[in-house]
Amino acid sequence: MRVVGEIPHPDCKITLFAWNNRYLIKFEQGLLEQTFKIHEYDVTSEADLRALVDETFISETLSRFEAMRNSLRNRLNVIG
């Protein structure tokens, strides 16, 4: 797996990878992560890959992190 780059953001870590004829966009926030896989033929360049990760996409991803955190917290409360 090759690191293509990182996209700076104050609320999460965003790393771009190239691997196995795919690009991966990995978001990390604390102990949670989300990875999006995109076939390399669906974008024409790494610049296109970066263009996909706009503020709308990041905002939607951050909202999912909140939902993931709530879901995990609720499940941990069941066993705790």
Residue locations for each model-derived region?
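Mixed-charge, Lys/Arg-enriched low-complexity segments
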Residues: 42-80
